[in-house]
């Protein structure tokens, strides 16, 4: 087996990526989320494939086809809830993975980090289009509101929105193309994830200390395969418990009503994992300004490598940066809460303050903290 593993062209690639890969000896469980994201993607593609076999991408029958999956298809309800809650699991792992990258300075691997940002955008696009497919009230109005934001783009906005819609409103053409894109994008995500891994394996993994670990490397297998498997079992057990006991906890009750263009839901809001960005969008009274802030709320991640001023890579020994990091995490929780609230006082001002704080911490306070810490440590 050893001979094949090191000589066969295909096996050699797998060997270099997952078996004989030299890995730092001190990476913690925060490094498990890469493999868990791979697991999430596999779960989503597999469950999505089975759903697509029974789903009908037509405005007249989309809602009914989802009901048919839940009622008449063998274990259809389970596949549907695994897929719906799998998206939430995906984003939980994604946000923890990004948080780890920020805390330990993994963003200094610029190519890996930038491909990761592209992956985040692709995943968000996929999740948004998937939410439209059941053709419930929140599906329809969410699609209308979010696609309509593009009309804020000067000169080409209106034409662009109608081009995406395939008509003058969200209708059959929109649903059909969203299904097509929702089906193809996960495979594009899988290919991009391979590029992400390719760039990562050029440099090797970072570690909690943020120092070079070339002098102390261990093989990925069996050490980290076993460690990843532990994470997989914990996540799968938690996930299945959630799916089987609280399948609708994260969903919107409005989405159990068929789409009705004549009846607007009282509070239009996206799924929980987009609420922080939605809160930032709503905190700016101007439409174009809101759209720019929405895009920047994710694109701001690209500024981390450019604004790294500290002489240490990791935040492990930088208390001021640690304080700011956890303030940022708290701020994101506040933004998520505000995104789900109606647009009325005191939520408006809380959202605006939280949005300003979000950009201030990333663009101003963290770089300044890095410089202060350099001075304190006489680096």
From Swiss-Prot:
Claim: 4Fe-4S is one of the keywords in the record: no
The positions annotated for binding heme b b566 are: 97, 196
Q: How does it sit in the membrane?
A: Multi-pass membrane protein
Q: Where in the cell is it found?
A: Mitochondrion inner membrane
**Cofactor or coenzyme needed:** heme b
Q: Say which domain of life the source belongs to.
A: Eukaryota
Where are the membrane-spanning stretches? 33-53, 77-98, 113-133, 178-198, 226-246, 288-308, 320-340, 347-367
Q: Which Pfam families does its entry note?
A: Cytochrom_B_C, Cytochrome_B
Record-level Gene Ontology MF annotations: metal ion binding; ubiquinol-cytochrome-c reductase activity
Q: Where does a ubiquinone bind?
A: 201
Q: Where does heme b b562 bind?
A: 83, 182
A Gene Ontology annotation in the biological process aspect, one of them, is: mitochondrial electron transport, ubiquinol to cytochrome c
Quick one: a GO cellular component term? Answer: respiratory chain complex III
Query: What are the alphabetically sorted keywords of the record?
Result: Electron transport, Heme, Iron, Membrane, Metal-binding, Mitochondrion, Mitochondrion inner membrane, Respiratory chain, Transmembrane, Transmembrane helix, Transport, Ubiquinone
Q: How is the cofactor bound?
A: Binds 2 heme b groups non-covalently.
Please give the coiled-coil regions recorded for this protein: none
Known role: Component of the ubiquinol-cytochrome c reductase complex (complex III or cytochrome b-c1 complex) that is part of the mitochondrial respiratory chain. The b-c1 complex mediates electron transfer from ubiquinol to cytochrome c. Contributes to the generation of a proton gradient across the mitochondrial membrane that is then used for ATP synthesis.
The record describes its quaternary structure and partners as: The cytochrome bc1 complex contains 11 subunits: 3 respiratory subunits (MT-CYB, CYC1 and UQCRFS1), 2 core proteins (UQCRC1 and UQCRC2) and 6 low-molecular weight proteins (UQCRH/QCR6, UQCRB/QCR7, UQCRQ/QCR8, UQCR10/QCR9, UQCR11/QCR10 and a cleavage product of UQCRFS1). This cytochrome bc1 complex then forms a dimer.
Q: Which family does it belong to?
A: Belongs to the cytochrome b family.
Further remark? Heme 1 (or BL or b562) is low-potential and absorbs at about 562 nm, and heme 2 (or BH or b566) is high-potential and absorbs at about 566 nm.
Q: What is this protein called?
A: Cytochrome b
Q: Which organism is it from?
A: Chaetodipus spinatus (Spiny pocket mouse)
């Amino acid at each position: 087996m050893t001979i094949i593993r090191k000589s066969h062209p295909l096996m050699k690639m797998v060997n270099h990526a997952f078996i004989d890969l030299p890995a730092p000896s001190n990476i913690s469980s925060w490094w498990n989320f890469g493999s868990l994201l791979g697991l999430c993607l596999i779960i989503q593609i597999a469950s999505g494939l089975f759903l697509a076999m029974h789903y009908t991408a037509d405005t007249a029958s989309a809602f009914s086809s989802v009901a048919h999956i839940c009622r008449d298809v063998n274990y259809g309800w389970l596949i549907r809830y695994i897929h719906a809650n799998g998206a939430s699991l995906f984003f939980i792992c994604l946000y923890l993975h990004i948080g780890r990258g920020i805390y330990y300075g993994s963003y200094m691997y610029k190519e890996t980090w930038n491909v990761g940002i592209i992956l985040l955008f692709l995943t968000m696009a996929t999740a948004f289009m998937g939410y439209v497919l059941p053709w419930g009230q929140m599906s329809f109005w969410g699609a209308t509101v979010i696609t309509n934001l593009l009309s804020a783009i000067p000169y080409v906005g209106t034409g662009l929105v109608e081009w995406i819609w395939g008509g003058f409103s969200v209708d059959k053409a929109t649903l059909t193309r969203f299904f097509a894109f929702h089906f193809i994008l996960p495979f594009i995500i899988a290919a991009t994830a391979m590029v992400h891994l390719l760039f990562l394996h050029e440099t090797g993994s970072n570690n909690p200390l943020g120092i070079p670990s070339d002098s102390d490397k261990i093989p990925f297998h069996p050490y980290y395969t076993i460690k990843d498997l532990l994470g997989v079992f914990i996540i799968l057990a938690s996930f299945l418990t959630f799916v089987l006991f609280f399948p609708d906890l994260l969903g919107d009750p409005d989405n159990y009503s068929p789409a009705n263009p004549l009846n607007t839901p009282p509070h239009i809001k996206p799924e929980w994992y987009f609420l922080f960005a939605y809160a930032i969008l709503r905190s700016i009274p101007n439409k174009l300004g809101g759209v720019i802030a929405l895009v920047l709320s994710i694109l701001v991640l690209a500024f981390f490598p450019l604004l790294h001023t500290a002489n240490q890579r990791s935040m492990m020994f930088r208390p001021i940066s640690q304080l700011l990091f956890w303030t940022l995490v708290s701020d994101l929780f506040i933004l998520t809460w505000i995104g789900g609230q109606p647009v009325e006082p005191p939520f408006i001002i809380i959202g605006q303050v939280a949005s300003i704080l979000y950009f201030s911490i990333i663009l101003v306070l963290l770089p300044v903290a890095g410089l202060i810490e350099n001075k304190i440590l006489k680096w």
